[in-house]
């Protein structure tokens, strides 16, 4: 854990000592810190750089934080992970394109994503996924651009792994021809 990381601490009460200590250790290592709590003005929230306080009120069964508090925390974590995936270039539109097709289930998902983005059929999806060694973003870029694997990888690297930016660059390049 270091300056390029973010540590998220989760506690319904916001007073779990080990979570507070984990955030303190993360701060000592120059990591950003986030608290997800279900209580106002908690010690954990005070420790974090960013505090997300999701006030859910008392549980239906007292002390059973897996119900309202846990459900609310799960929703917040889903939002944080989704936003992170978008910011990291793993998403194109509403599709999780940063997918390595390493088994049958993922291969089928990669084919569907490829077809949705390119408009090509599943046979072409298989062909390009084979050429890209299962890398969905690379397969899409190869199909759309006509680039070989190395040129497509270079184009993707030049756009920091963002498929959308790489596709825009290709379209812009072709407009100028």
Where are these regions (language model features)?
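Glycine-rich phosphate-binding loops that contact phosphosugars or nucleotide phosphates
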Residues: 1-75, 84-88
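Short, amphipathic alpha-helical interaction segments embedded in low-complexity terminal/linker regions
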Residues: 79, 84-177
